[in-house]
């Protein structure tokens, strides 16, 4: 990778829980994790099981941004290879916290005995657990965060680098005022990632579950003038044949369902 690149790699795009087997071999079964490279900066969006396949070394200390703390978005963190690299100091930004102590306590409820053998702060890389700010600057990479709409809360991210931008909207349920805010937040994005766990017809029965559909993602893409849409957070029961069938019904050339291993260079 040239250090001037701005890219996103899908390490996992399954929602709610990971699911393996041949029926998930095309789109992947690992839960939410996306690796963004911006020059020498590396940022991971969430840390589901997909982060277990991430590299162990980086040009600079990697950063993990968590949208929320539901298990499917943090369950891979304990097996993140970089945490065992003593030459790195991983920074993990935790939402809905005001202090380092709150950030450590939030993840410490899971990553500590008896649920996990060691605390995250005891790993070789001595990672820093920090409260997630509304804005974060990493070299030339600018990151903004706003709240979405999901039970318990979930953050939405926009990453800007050298005139290009990625917007990450996972675990989002349509609500008029928050959707209007998303339209403004995603304006002109080069790549929009959007939760499409359900089909439009399923949404009434899934009200309150905190997820969206491809149709709503396309509406956001069109209203915000985003250039490309990647549909994410696949339902555990939406196997390859289901997602492939849904993909054949898409009429937009710049809309597709995410696949594990897929790399998009902006």
Predicted regions, residues:
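Binuclear metal-dependent hydrolase catalytic cores
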Residues: 1-167, 182-183, 243-266
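Active-site flanking residues adjacent to catalytic metal/cofactor-binding acidic residues
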Residues: 45, 67, 169-170, 194-196, ...
